[in-house]
Amino acid sequence: MSYSNSIIFGPIPSRRFGISLGIDLSPGKKQCNFDCLYCELEGAKTVDKMDEYPSVENIINEIKNSFKTHHKIDVITLTANGEPTLYPKLDELINEINKIKANTKTLILSNGSTIYKKEIYDALLKIDIVKLSLDCISEKCFKKLDRVNNSVETQKIVPAMIDFSRQTKNDLVLEILFVKDLNDKIDEIELLNKAINQIKPKRVDIGTIDRPPAYQVKPVTYEFLEDVASEFKNINVNIVYKNRPKSMQTYSEDEI
Protein backbone atom coordinates (compact mmCIF):
# COMPACT_ATOMS: atom_id res chain seq x y z
CA MET A 1 0.00 0.00 0.00
CA SER A 2 1.28 3.47 -0.89
CA TYR A 3 0.70 6.55 1.25
CA SER A 4 0.22 10.07 -0.05
CA ASN A 5 2.45 11.95 2.44
CA SER A 6 -0.20 14.66 2.43
CA ILE A 7 -0.98 16.15 5.84
CA ILE A 8 -4.31 17.65 4.75
CA PHE A 9 -7.21 15.83 3.13
CA GLY A 10 -10.54 17.33 2.25
CA PRO A 11 -12.52 19.29 3.12
CA ILE A 12 -15.11 16.54 2.82
CA PRO A 13 -18.80 16.53 3.84
CA SER A 14 -19.71 14.56 6.95
CA ARG A 15 -23.34 13.81 7.79
CA ARG A 16 -22.60 14.12 11.49
CA PHE A 17 -19.96 16.82 11.64
CA GLY A 18 -20.54 19.04 8.59
CA ILE A 19 -17.62 20.08 6.37
CA SER A 20 -14.53 18.34 7.76
CA LEU A 21 -10.89 19.24 7.17
CA GLY A 22 -8.82 16.13 7.81
CA ILE A 23 -5.36 16.23 9.38
CA ASP A 24 -3.22 13.09 8.97
CA LEU A 25 -0.63 12.95 11.75
CA SER A 26 1.13 9.99 10.13
CA PRO A 27 0.87 10.66 6.40
CA GLY A 28 3.92 8.67 5.28
CA LYS A 29 3.22 5.26 6.77
CA LYS A 30 1.03 3.28 9.16
CA GLN A 31 2.04 3.83 12.79
CA CYS A 32 -0.36 2.22 15.25
CA ASN A 33 -0.34 0.41 18.59
CA PHE A 34 -3.16 -1.82 17.29
CA ASP A 35 -3.10 -4.14 14.28
CA CYS A 36 -6.85 -4.65 14.02
CA LEU A 37 -7.97 -7.56 11.89
CA TYR A 38 -10.57 -5.36 10.19
CA CYS A 39 -8.29 -2.38 9.47
CA GLU A 40 -8.67 -0.95 5.98
CA LEU A 41 -4.92 -0.24 5.94
CA GLU A 42 -2.46 -3.05 5.37
CA GLY A 43 -1.40 -5.17 8.33
CA ALA A 44 1.70 -3.87 10.08
CA LYS A 45 3.81 -4.46 13.16
CA THR A 46 2.47 -2.47 16.09
CA VAL A 47 4.47 0.39 17.60
CA ASP A 48 4.28 2.32 20.86
CA LYS A 49 5.39 5.65 19.40
CA MET A 50 5.73 7.46 16.08
CA ASP A 51 9.20 7.81 14.61
CA GLU A 52 8.12 9.73 11.50
CA TYR A 53 5.71 12.65 11.70
CA PRO A 54 5.08 16.21 10.46
CA SER A 55 6.05 19.17 12.62
CA VAL A 56 3.47 21.24 14.47
CA GLU A 57 4.56 24.26 12.43
CA ASN A 58 3.94 22.49 9.12
CA ILE A 59 0.51 21.26 10.24
CA ILE A 60 -0.57 24.71 11.40
CA ASN A 61 0.63 26.30 8.15
CA GLU A 62 -1.36 23.73 6.16
CA ILE A 63 -4.48 24.48 8.20
CA LYS A 64 -4.05 28.23 7.73
CA ASN A 65 -3.67 27.76 3.98
CA SER A 66 -6.82 25.63 3.90
CA PHE A 67 -8.73 28.31 5.80
CA LYS A 68 -7.72 30.81 3.10
CA THR A 69 -9.05 28.56 0.35
CA HIS A 70 -12.07 27.08 2.10
CA HIS A 71 -14.11 29.57 4.07
CA LYS A 72 -16.69 27.09 5.36
CA ILE A 73 -15.02 24.43 7.52
CA ASP A 74 -17.12 23.11 10.39
CA VAL A 75 -14.63 20.75 12.00
CA ILE A 76 -10.90 20.02 12.00
CA THR A 77 -10.50 16.26 12.26
CA LEU A 78 -7.31 14.82 13.73
CA THR A 79 -6.63 11.33 12.47
CA ALA A 80 -3.71 9.24 11.19
CA ASN A 81 -2.61 6.25 9.19
CA GLY A 82 -2.62 4.55 12.57
CA GLU A 83 -3.27 6.06 15.99
CA PRO A 84 -3.24 9.89 16.21
CA THR A 85 -2.57 10.02 19.96
CA LEU A 86 0.87 8.50 19.31
CA TYR A 87 1.81 11.85 17.75
CA PRO A 88 4.49 13.04 20.22
CA LYS A 89 3.51 16.72 20.16
CA LEU A 90 -0.24 16.25 20.42
CA ASP A 91 -0.79 18.69 23.28
CA GLU A 92 1.24 21.42 21.59
CA LEU A 93 -0.61 20.85 18.32
CA ILE A 94 -4.03 21.08 19.97
CA ASN A 95 -3.04 24.29 21.74
CA GLU A 96 -1.91 25.84 18.44
CA ILE A 97 -5.04 24.72 16.59
CA ASN A 98 -7.23 26.18 19.32
CA LYS A 99 -5.53 29.54 18.82
CA ILE A 100 -6.54 29.75 15.15
CA LYS A 101 -9.74 27.72 14.80
CA ALA A 102 -12.21 30.46 15.83
CA ASN A 103 -15.70 28.86 15.69
CA THR A 104 -14.50 25.71 13.93
CA LYS A 105 -14.77 22.62 16.12
CA THR A 106 -12.03 20.08 16.67
CA LEU A 107 -12.53 16.31 16.45
CA ILE A 108 -10.15 13.41 17.06
CA LEU A 109 -10.69 9.82 15.89
CA SER A 110 -8.75 7.55 18.26
CA ASN A 111 -8.69 3.88 19.18
CA GLY A 112 -8.87 4.95 22.83
CA SER A 113 -5.81 2.95 23.84
CA THR A 114 -3.82 5.80 25.38
CA ILE A 115 -6.53 7.68 27.28
CA TYR A 116 -5.25 6.45 30.64
CA LYS A 117 -1.96 8.32 30.07
CA LYS A 118 -2.17 11.69 31.80
CA GLU A 119 -0.60 13.72 28.99
CA ILE A 120 -3.04 12.24 26.45
CA TYR A 121 -6.03 12.51 28.79
CA ASP A 122 -5.28 16.19 29.44
CA ALA A 123 -4.78 16.91 25.73
CA LEU A 124 -8.09 15.25 24.80
CA LEU A 125 -9.94 17.46 27.28
CA LYS A 126 -9.09 20.41 24.99
CA ILE A 127 -10.79 18.86 21.94
CA ASP A 128 -14.44 19.64 21.16
CA ILE A 129 -15.42 16.13 20.04
CA VAL A 130 -13.51 13.03 21.12
CA LYS A 131 -14.47 9.84 19.29
CA LEU A 132 -12.96 6.67 20.75
CA SER A 133 -13.14 3.06 19.61
CA LEU A 134 -14.11 0.35 22.08
CA ASP A 135 -14.41 -2.98 20.27
CA CYS A 136 -13.61 -5.17 23.25
CA ILE A 137 -13.57 -5.29 27.02
CA SER A 138 -11.95 -8.65 27.75
CA GLU A 139 -8.20 -9.07 27.44
CA LYS A 140 -8.72 -12.10 25.19
CA CYS A 141 -10.81 -10.09 22.73
CA PHE A 142 -8.37 -7.17 22.68
CA LYS A 143 -5.51 -9.52 21.81
CA LYS A 144 -7.44 -11.48 19.19
CA LEU A 145 -9.34 -8.71 17.40
CA ASP A 146 -7.38 -5.50 18.00
CA ARG A 147 -3.98 -7.25 18.34
CA VAL A 148 -2.65 -4.63 20.74
CA ASN A 149 0.96 -3.64 21.27
CA ASN A 150 2.44 -4.97 24.51
CA SER A 151 2.73 -1.41 25.82
CA VAL A 152 -1.07 -1.00 25.97
CA GLU A 153 -2.54 -1.62 29.43
CA THR A 154 -6.00 -2.63 28.30
CA GLN A 155 -7.42 -2.94 31.83
CA LYS A 156 -6.91 0.80 32.32
CA ILE A 157 -8.85 1.91 29.24
CA VAL A 158 -12.46 1.69 30.45
CA PRO A 159 -11.80 3.25 33.90
CA ALA A 160 -10.04 6.14 32.16
CA MET A 161 -12.96 6.57 29.75
CA ILE A 162 -15.40 6.64 32.67
CA ASP A 163 -13.37 9.33 34.40
CA PHE A 164 -12.87 11.29 31.17
CA SER A 165 -16.61 11.33 30.50
CA ARG A 166 -17.20 12.82 33.94
CA GLN A 167 -14.50 15.45 33.54
CA THR A 168 -14.96 16.64 29.96
CA LYS A 169 -17.24 19.56 29.15
CA ASN A 170 -17.24 18.54 25.50
CA ASP A 171 -18.65 15.62 23.49
CA LEU A 172 -17.51 12.02 23.94
CA VAL A 173 -18.60 9.53 21.27
CA LEU A 174 -17.80 5.81 21.27
CA GLU A 175 -17.52 3.53 18.26
CA ILE A 176 -17.80 -0.26 18.24
CA LEU A 177 -16.99 -2.27 15.13
CA PHE A 178 -18.37 -5.80 15.32
CA VAL A 179 -16.64 -8.67 13.52
CA LYS A 180 -18.22 -12.06 12.97
CA ASP A 181 -17.05 -14.74 15.43
CA LEU A 182 -14.78 -12.34 17.30
CA ASN A 183 -16.58 -9.71 19.42
CA ASP A 184 -20.14 -10.73 18.57
CA LYS A 185 -20.63 -13.23 21.41
CA ILE A 186 -23.10 -12.56 24.19
CA ASP A 187 -20.44 -12.45 26.93
CA GLU A 188 -18.50 -9.68 25.19
CA ILE A 189 -21.67 -7.76 24.33
CA GLU A 190 -22.74 -7.85 27.98
CA LEU A 191 -19.33 -6.52 29.03
CA LEU A 192 -19.59 -3.75 26.43
CA ASN A 193 -23.11 -2.86 27.57
CA LYS A 194 -21.99 -2.59 31.19
CA ALA A 195 -18.95 -0.49 30.29
CA ILE A 196 -20.88 1.89 28.05
CA ASN A 197 -23.50 2.50 30.72
CA GLN A 198 -20.69 3.42 33.10
CA ILE A 199 -18.91 5.63 30.57
CA LYS A 200 -22.13 7.44 29.55
CA PRO A 201 -20.99 8.83 26.17
CA LYS A 202 -23.10 11.27 24.19
CA ARG A 203 -23.58 8.64 21.49
CA VAL A 204 -22.43 5.17 20.49
CA ASP A 205 -21.89 4.31 16.82
CA ILE A 206 -22.03 0.59 16.08
CA GLY A 207 -21.08 -0.91 12.75
CA THR A 208 -19.19 -3.64 10.97
CA ILE A 209 -16.70 -4.17 8.15
CA ASP A 210 -17.68 -2.35 4.94
CA ARG A 211 -14.28 -2.04 3.23
CA PRO A 212 -11.69 -4.69 2.34
CA PRO A 213 -9.98 -5.61 5.64
CA ALA A 214 -6.30 -6.24 6.28
CA TYR A 215 -7.02 -9.84 7.25
CA GLN A 216 -9.58 -12.52 6.40
CA VAL A 217 -12.47 -11.56 8.66
CA LYS A 218 -16.18 -11.16 7.98
CA PRO A 219 -18.86 -8.59 8.86
CA VAL A 220 -21.90 -9.17 11.02
CA THR A 221 -25.38 -8.60 9.63
CA TYR A 222 -27.54 -5.51 9.94
CA GLU A 223 -30.04 -7.57 11.93
CA PHE A 224 -27.31 -8.41 14.43
CA LEU A 225 -26.53 -4.70 14.86
CA GLU A 226 -30.23 -4.01 15.41
CA ASP A 227 -30.32 -6.66 18.11
CA VAL A 228 -27.25 -5.19 19.80
CA ALA A 229 -28.73 -1.69 19.66
CA SER A 230 -31.85 -2.96 21.38
CA GLU A 231 -29.70 -4.53 24.12
CA PHE A 232 -27.91 -1.25 24.86
CA LYS A 233 -30.41 0.33 27.22
CA ASN A 234 -30.46 4.06 28.06
CA ILE A 235 -27.86 4.78 25.37
CA ASN A 236 -28.07 6.89 22.21
CA VAL A 237 -27.16 4.35 19.52
CA ASN A 238 -26.49 4.98 15.84
CA ILE A 239 -26.17 2.03 13.47
CA VAL A 240 -23.60 2.65 10.74
CA TYR A 241 -24.19 0.18 7.94
CA LYS A 242 -23.59 0.41 4.21
CA ASN A 243 -26.82 -0.04 2.23
CA ARG A 244 -28.79 -0.35 5.44
CA PRO A 245 -32.29 -1.68 4.75
CA LYS A 246 -34.00 0.91 6.91
CA SER A 247 -33.34 3.82 9.23
CA MET A 248 -32.87 3.01 12.86
CA GLN A 249 -32.02 5.93 15.12
CA THR A 250 -32.45 6.06 18.87
CA TYR A 251 -30.71 9.37 19.36
CA SER A 252 -32.39 12.78 19.35
CA GLU A 253 -32.22 15.23 16.46
CA ASP A 254 -29.90 17.59 18.30
CA GLU A 255 -27.22 14.91 18.73
CA ILE A 256 -23.96 15.57 16.91
Question: Where are the regions a protein language model picked out?
Answer:
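Canonical Radical SAM [4Fe-4S] cluster-binding loop centered on the CxxxCxxC motif
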Residues: 16-57
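Glycine-rich beta-strand-to-loop/alpha-helix junction loops that act as flexible
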Residues: 77-83, 111-112
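Short, basic/glycine-rich phosphate-binding loops at helix/coil junctions
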Residues: 40-43, 72-75, 137-141, 172-173
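Conserved alpha-helical substructure of the radical SAM core
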Residues: 42-78, 88-92
